[in-house]
Curated annotation (Swiss-Prot):
It comes from Oryza sativa subsp. japonica (Rice). SMART domains: LRR_CC. One of its GO terms (cellular component) is SCF ubiquitin ligase complex. Pfam families: F-box_5 (PF18511), Transp_inhibit (PF18791). The myo-inositol hexakisphosphate acts as a structural cofactor. SUPFAM superfamilies: RNI-like (SSF52047). The keyword Nucleus applies. The F-box is necessary for the interaction with SKP1. Its main location: nucleus. This is Transport inhibitor response 1-like protein Os11g0515500. Residues 1-45 form the F-box domain. The record marks E155, F369, R478 as: Interaction with auxin-responsive proteins. The keyword Nucleus applies.
Length: 568
């Protein structure tokens, strides 16, 4: 057998960008494992409780970029996922840290202070869906991290104490390339923002919150016409009359703009103002513009011939989607959200989805909230778009059958998984029986994430999926009849999966205990409304579990579980 020198192996590994590929080569042999761990610069931890921070740093002593994911989407408030242990471990073992990305974690101001004071050379801080910190923490980061290129607060809950943090970035100029504070709910110091933009010549991505006035936006665009990504501010604040012409002129000079979002409180009046940038847009997010009439939306979208990603509200209607399908033939991702999240009705149906699939045959990803669906429509979509890697369909009435025949939607979803060989993410809704799970287990060979609700007849349905989907990583099931037999039937698969979420199913405490006794590398967390359960009390074994979260770990049971969680 021929062995490559370490330098050659390290050089080869340098061409592997994905975490999946790096993980795979580390399993080839001990020598490759050693070279890979010493040369790894970027690490992704998909579950903050899957491994201890100290162990991650011990394995990868040379890492420069760390990404950690926290709580799952469905867990109750107070579940955990504190960022402090991870930041403290970085301080102790990773002096060269340059990038930190945290998702759905609890980040305090003290945590941000520790981070900023310990890593003055930090270049990128991304906090997605995080909470627990305020603008005081942001001020500390801006003051101390003088080489910051990216600060992204996407969908985080930030306590607004004041807006002085915008004035804390280094003077006379910054290295900022990307700034996202669209999630902030408080007022923004407009003069400080304008000065910051003026001092950031490398700025290419800017996402403002809804308190930034229209006239300020116009001046920002005039100052930085080479933006590539923009989330606009408010369209109803500031000197609107005076800013209208200025904004139109500013957009005319934004020839590099590719991604546009925001449109906070925008009305149909302002759509023509944005028209100059239509021809170059590849990403357009209109999900925050409920007051723009569909006719104006359609007219605007039709001018975006290069569009690859489109997010809209369902008031665009089936007719609007048909026009989009004929105009945006390069479309690769479509998301249609309900304009009224509390409504059980929608203005889009299966007709809009079929039209999009017919006109946009490059479509790879769909998230579609609709009023009704049919098997024939899904079969047609499957034939038109075999490139799907992500297909998420939400029928607003979760138990809805085929709107024409009254049959379950099994055959339609079966066509999706059979035609779309590269499907990795699937979300189902509507009236579904065990048959759809049989199809998924038979045909969805590459499926990694599956989310279902109000589906199935017996334990067989879940068993079909666990036995058939060898690449499954995440399984989320809500309000379905699966019980202990289905749970225990998947033991062979759980070692390879990242997590399993079950809520309002038929699993009992006894089933959870049986699984825990057989699989020591799993954390099995039962979430109760009351205090923790006495594990030794067998009288509780027949009680159904309301919420269950199972995940693979090499760290053992966590020490910060709140009282409403019992770990087996």
């Amino acid at each position: 057998m021929v062995f490559f020198p370490e330098e050659v192996v390290e050089h080869i590994l340098g061409f592997l960008a994905s975490h999946r590929d790096r993980n795979a080569v580390s399993l080839v042999c001990r020598e490759w494992y050693r070279v890979e761990r010493l040369s790894r610069r970027s690490v992704l931890v998909r579950n903050c409780y899957a491994a201890r921070p100290e162990r991650v740093h011990a394995r990868f002593p040379g890492l420069r970029s760390l990404s950690v994911k926290g709580r799952p989407r469905f867990v109750p408030a107070g579940w955990g996922a504190a960022a402090r242990p991870w930041v403290a471990a970085c301080v102790a073992a990773c002096p060269g840290l340059e990038e930190l990305r945290l998702k759905r974690m609890v980040v305090t101001d003290g945590c941000l202070k520790l981070l900023a004071c310990s890593f003055p050379n930090l270049k990128s801080l991304v906090l997605v869906g995080c909470q627990g910190f305020s603008t005081d923490g942001l001020a500390t980061v801006a003051t101390n991290c003088r080489f910051m290129k990216e600060l992204d607060l996407q969908e985080s809950l930030v306590e607004d104490r004041d807006s002085r943090w915008l004035g804390c970035f280094p003077k006379p100029s910054t290295l900022l390339e990307s700034l996202n504070f669209s999630c902030l709910t408080g007022e923004v110091n407009s003069p400080a923002l304008e000065i910051l933009v003026a001092r950031s010549p490398n700025l290419r991505s800017l996402r403002l919150n809804r308190s930034v006035p229209l006239d300020v936006l116009a001046r920002i665009l005039c100052r930085r016409p080479r933006l590539v990504d923009l989330c606009t501010g408010s369209f109803v604040r500031g000197n609107i009359v005076g800013a209208y012409a200025g904004l139109f002129n500013s957009f005319q000079h934004c020839s590099l703009l590719k991604s546009l979002s925001g449109f906070w409180d925008a009305t149909s009046l302002f759509i023509p103002v944005i028209a100059p940038v239509c021809k170059n847009l590849t990403c357009l997010n209109l999900s925050s513009a409920p007051m723009v009439r569909s006719a104006y939306l359609i007219e605007f979208i039709c001018q975006c011939k290069k569009l690859q990603q489109l997010w809209v509200l369902d008031h665009i209607g089936d007719e609007g989607l048909k026009i989009v399908a004929s105009s945006c033939i390069q479309l690769q991702e479509l998301r249609v959200f309900p304009a009224n999240a509390n409504a059980r009705a929608s203005t889009v149906t299966e007709e809009g989805l079929v039209a999009i699939s017919a006109g946009c045959n490059k479509l790879q990803s769909v998230l579609y909230f609709c009023q009704r669906m049919t098997n024939s429509a899904l079969i047609t979509v499957a034939k038109n778009c075999p490139r799907f890697t992500s297909f998420r369909l939400c029928v607003l009435d979760p138990g809805s059958a085929d709107a024409v025949t009254g049959q379950p939607l099994d055959e339609g979803y079966g066509a999706i998984v059979q035609s779309c060989k590269g499907l990795r993410r699937l979300c189902l809704s509507g009236l579904l029986t065990d048959t759809v799970f049989l199809y998924i287990g038979m045909y969805a060979e590459r499926l990694e994430m599956l989310s279902v609700a109000f589906a199935g007849d017996t334990d067989d349905g879940m068993t079909y999926v666990l036995n058939g989907c060898k690449n499954l990583k995440k399984l989320e099931i809500r309000d379905s009849p699966f019980g202990d037999s289905a749970l225990l039937a998947g033991m062979h698969q759980y070692e390879a999966m990242r997590s399993l979420w079950l809520s309002s199913c038929n699993v009992t405490l006894g089933g959870c205990k049986s699984l825990a006794a057989s699989m020591a590398n799993l954390n099995i967390e039962v979430m109760n409304r009351a205090a923790s359960i006495n594990e030794a009390d067998n009288a509780n074994d027949a009680k159904k579990v309301k919420k269950l979260y199972i995940y693979r770990t090499v760290a053992g049971p966590r020490g910060d579980a709140p009282e409403f969680i019992s770990t087996f």
